Amino acid sequence: MIESENPNTLDEPVIQTILRDLKMIGFKLYHVILPRGNAANVLRDWDLWGPLILCLVMAIFLSISAEEQKALEFTIVFVVVWCGAAIVTVNGQLLCGNISFFQSVCILGYCIFPLTIATIIIWIIQNFTMIVKLPIVGGAWFWSSFASYGFLGSSVPESRRLLAVYPVLLFYLVIAWLVVVQ
């Protein structure tokens, strides 16, 4: 059998597949940390592993910090993130967006990374007052919103851009509020 330059991924070892996926997750997180206007490479290869991991980490930390009904807190965070991303994506599609459903959900999911970091920071130092929590989470909300605008802002016609961005801001605001009230 002749080895090709691009082997079939079904033939590669599991560890190689996991490392390749982790590398792609890191690449996408890098673009969220340092948002740039050119997001074509990030949007081309969408995945849902990174958003799932970020959502699970956020939901776990918020449910751990809940005093009562930890399972309910986990469920609320998980449902708000995924249903909210789906609703915002459908809104973008209805406004003649030019990216696919899963590309948009992928980007919205990766852009919760700053809010996930804020959740972990607030969980580590649990005695934060609201005065300290608000700037941390507010900065994470702005960062998430700014990063997602860099990806999704150009996918909608300019005349409808505000109609597409406003629900994204609300989506991240709801998630930020869940982090603040933990």
Curated annotation (Swiss-Prot):
Transmembrane segments: 46-66, 71-91, 105-125, 134-154, 162-182
The entry's keywords: Golgi apparatus, Membrane, Transmembrane, Transmembrane helix
Residues in compartment: Lumenal: 67-70, 126-133
Keyword NAD: no
Membrane topology, from the record: Multi-pass membrane protein
GO process terms (BP): endoplasmic reticulum to Golgi vesicle-mediated transport
Subcellular location: Golgi apparatus membrane
Pfam family of the protein (one): Yip1
Membrane side Cytoplasmic: residue ranges: 1-45, 92-104, 155-161
Keyword Transmembrane: yes
Family the entry assigns: Belongs to the YIP1 family.
UniProt name for this protein: Protein YIPF6 homolog
Name of the gene: yipf6
